[in-house]
Amino acid sequence: MGFSPLISCSAMGALILSCLLLQASNSNAQLRPDFYFRTCPSVFNIIGDIIVDELRTDPRIAASLLRLHFHDCFVRGCDASILLDNSTSFRTEKDAAPNANSARGFGVIDRMKTSLERACPRTVSCADVLTIASQISVLLSGGPWWPVPLGRRDSVEAFFDLANTALPSPFFTLAQLKKAFADVGLNRPSDLVALSGGHTFGRAQCQFVTPRLYNFNGTNRPDPTLDPTYLVQLRALCPQNGNGTVLVNFDVVTPNTFDRQYYTNLRNGKGLIQSDQELFSTPGADTIPLVNLYSSNTFAFFGAFVDAMIRMGNLRPLTGTQGEIRQNCRVVNSRIRGMENDDGVVSSI
């Protein structure tokens, strides 16, 4: 069954053009929303058209692209290090536990980068491709638009070890979540609660859900915060000792739509993973009022989400002469030049 985008495909060109013009009216000291206004004015059209096309056959891709951006930014900043494949110099972040056999959408990013290299050679960084893709993915799924500051450059290395420690776990308590966010500079409760709202669409594997269904914290009992009816439903999808890679919707009501239903689910004991439910079920937590607010006020949620996304997108960006503009998001440019010198062939990478 295909995807019917909440914004029609025919309106995509006009929509992205209007977004680009709006972005041109904004500015930022290091990163600027109008960074590609003259050098690659088609960047939003190219990325947006590819996402629309992918959504027709893969309704998960919007959430997957947003997650890629999140996982990139939490590891040494938004520098596209998550997109690099293994090399002789470093191990890929794709092999890290939070990403292995889980992170997806790399081929879609490749498709975007290939198209952009044809239209605007060596101009748009992979970090900005991923940032723009996450923005448009949210927009096409019913969420807000925001002026994305641009001008990031790409890392020339990956950080496997850091990816294993910096990314929040689905089994984290609220205290652990707060520390993980604060460690990267996102220290406001609204950062944590709003960005967690990215789980309003997409899916998770049973392996990240099963422990709280059968043996929560070694009690041989389910997580007491789970709604009993929801527990029965989840056990049917994720049987004990079953296939851990089976996918379950984060949001049982509107699984492919970016909306405030996620927060209503938390209030009803229907958060899919432990780290989500912790936002509402931790006694006395300062996150509870925010969950209550966002569950009843779309404007408040969207505003907080936009603010948090911009803050996250500004984490330790490489700018100016730092890093590089990768020609291929999977490899650093020096490797491409080496292969050209040795073989005269780049397409095999």
Swiss-Prot record:
Substrate binds at P168. Its cofactor is Ca(2+); heme b. Binds 2 calcium ions per subunit. Binds 1 heme b (iron(II)-protoporphyrin IX) group per subunit. The record marks R67 as: Transition state stabilizer. The keyword Repeat does not apply. One of its GO terms (cellular component) is vacuole. Its EC number is 1.11.1.7. Ca(2+) 1 binds at D72, V75, G77, D79, S81. The keyword Zinc does not apply. Ca(2+) 2 binds at T200, D251, T254, D259. Heme b binds at H199. CDD domains: secretory_peroxidase. InterPro entries: Haem_peroxidase (IPR002016), Haem_peroxidase_sf (IPR010255), Peroxidase_pln (IPR000823), Peroxidases_AS (IPR019794), Peroxidases_heam-ligand_BS (IPR019793), Secretory_peroxidase (IPR033905). It catalyses: 2 a phenolic donor + H2O2 = 2 a phenolic radical donor + 2 H2O. It is an enzyme of class 1 (oxidoreductase). GO terms for molecular function: heme binding; lactoperoxidase activity; metal ion binding. Keywords: Calcium, Disulfide bond, Glycoprotein, Heme, Hydrogen peroxide, Iron, Metal-binding, Oxidoreductase, Peroxidase, Secreted, Signal, Vacuole. PANTHER family: PEROXIDASE 22-RELATED, PEROXIDASE 72-RELATED. Belongs to the peroxidase family. Classical plant (class III) peroxidase subfamily. This is Peroxidase C3. It comes from Armoracia rusticana.
